[in-house]
Regions:
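The serine-hydrolase catalytic nucleophile loop
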Residues: 36-48
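Primarily recognizes the serine-hydrolase "nucleophile elbow" in alpha/beta-hydrolase
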Residues: 92-149
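Alpha/beta-hydrolase active-site loop
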Residues: 77-99
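C-terminal catalytic histidine-bearing segment of alpha/beta-hydrolase fold enzymes
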Residues: 207-210, 214-253
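Conserved alpha/beta-hydrolase
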Residues: 47-72
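N-terminal cap/lid segment of alpha/beta-hydrolase-fold proteins
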Residues: 1-24
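The feature captures the conserved acid-bearing segment of alpha/beta-hydrolase catalytic domains
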Residues: 152-202
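Short beta-strand element of the alpha/beta-hydrolase
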Residues: 25-35
Length: 253
């Protein structure tokens, strides 16, 4: 039987999803990050699939989302949220390590904003064993430049990309950029998926990152999957593929 528990880890609301017979065992653990304006509840079906395949799923509410929502979002909070996810990731993992519920088989998966988070986690945490990024982006600087003339700016005041604005935000964006230091993938298993017709988190930027790294030794376990005619939406086949990928790399290796 699959059990879902509400927990709070140092003021981070989470759902933990695991098979009942595994709840007190040391098993592979995956942190699942929802997308923009989503919540931990949006990932329950995915967490259940992970649990059925021998993993523990941790589903946090990200900053300004779910139980942590304080007001309506305007889009400019994106990188603050991803930066906070990076700060909180070792806290979430550490809580389970203290209880001897996870060893080195630690994974992360994210959708859209969560997929961007997954890339940032690969940059910062060598202990992350395997990762899945679904319709994410590994290059915050290029994404930020693109977003200024994209659908992200609908109903928002125009922003001029001045040198002063660039000086203010570029260091923070670079600190989250796996594209700047792709060698930090370091041979780890990474699955990347994107819908070709995605206009909200552009396919082209993500595919360009993959093309840049695919023949490098450090990326020998990076797998790319794309689905034609799919917009900003994760297909069930992509979810199935990501569950199988994490099962193979975290449970069966």
């Amino acid at each position: 039987m699959i059990i879902i528990q509400e927990k709070n880890i140092e003021q981070i609301p989470i759902l933990e999803i695991v098979q009942e017979e595994n709840k007190d065992k040391m098993i592979p653990t995956v942190v699942c990050y929802h997308g923009w304006t989503g919540s931990k509840e949006n990932c329950i079906h995915y967490g259940a699939m992970l649990a059925k395949n021998g993993m523990r799923a941790i589903l946090p509410d990200q900053l300004y989302h779910g139980e942590r929502k304080t007001s309506e979002l305007n889009g400019f909070e994106l990188w603050e949220i991803i930066g906070q996810n990076v700060k909180e990731f070792p806290t979430l993992v550490g809580a389970y390590q203290k209880e001897n519920l996870v060893d080195n088989k630690i994974g992360a998966i994210g959708f859209s904003m969560g997929g961007m988070t997954t890339y940032a986690l690969l940059k910062h945490f060598p202990f992350l064993y395997a990762a899945v990024s679904l319709m994410g982006n590994a290059d915050p600087v290029e994404f930020a430049k693109w977003s200024l003339t994209s659908t992200w700016m609908e109903d928002k005041p125009a922003v001029e990309l001045t040198p002063e604005l660039m000086d203010k935000y570029i260091p923070m964006l670079q600190s989250l950029s796996l594209a700047d230091t792709p060698e930090k993938i370091a041979g780890r298993p990474v699955l990347i998926w994107h819908g070709v017709e995605d206009k909200k988190v552009p396919y082209a930027l993500n595919h360009a990152f993959y093309e840049k790294i695919k023949d490098e030794p450090y990326a020998n376990r990076v797998k790319w999957i794309e689905t034609p005619d799919v917009p900003h939406f994760v297909t069930f086949k992509a979810i199935e593929a990501s569950v199988e990928f994490l099962k193979q790399t975290l449970v069966e290796e």
